[in-house]
Design a protein with these regions (language model features):
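Intrinsically disordered, low-complexity regulatory regions in eukaryotic proteins
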Residues: 1-103
Length: 103
C-alpha cells in the first residue's frame, strides 16, 4: 500500500502537491507544511504527539511498472485539524521539550 499523499497542511491549509519538498508527515501520515511543523507545532503532531519527517516525493515517471504518481494517485481529500488552535498550542507546549523517540 502506498503512502497517502494528502493535498494540504492540516494547520494552515496551504496546498502541498505530491512533489512538495516542504511537506512533513508523522507516522500516521498527518500532513503539515514545514513552516507550521517547525514554527507553530514545534515538531509535535497535534493529533498523535509524535514528531515529523520530510514526506517522500512519489516519482513522477514510471520507471517500474505501476510505480509513479499517475498510477498511485495522491489523495484529493483535504484534511483539517480536529482541535482548536488553543488546544493544539497547549498540547504542543506539553510535549515540545520531549524528544520524539521518548514521547
Amino acid at each position: 500500500m502506498a503512502l497517502q499523499l494528502r493535498p494540504n497542511c492540516e494547520y494552515c491549509d496551504k496546498d502541498l502537491p505530491p512533489n512538495a519538498a516542504e511537506a512533513r508527515i508523522c507516522s500516521y501520515e498527518c500532513t503539515f507544511c514545514a513552516d507550521c511543523a517547525d514554527n507553530e507545532l514545534h515538531n509535535v503532531c497535534p493529533n498523535c504527539g509524535g514528531g515529523f519527517e520530510r514526506r517522500p516525493i512519489r516519482p513522477a515517471i514510471e520507471r517500474r511498472p505501476g510505480v509513479c504518481v499517475t498510477k498511485q494517485l495522491p489523495s484529493d481529500k483535504r484534511v483539517h485539524l480536529k482541535y482548536s488552535v488553543e488546544d493544539v498550542a497547549a498540547h504542543c507546549a506539553r510535549l515540545r521539550d520531549i524528544p520524539p523517540q521518548e514521547r
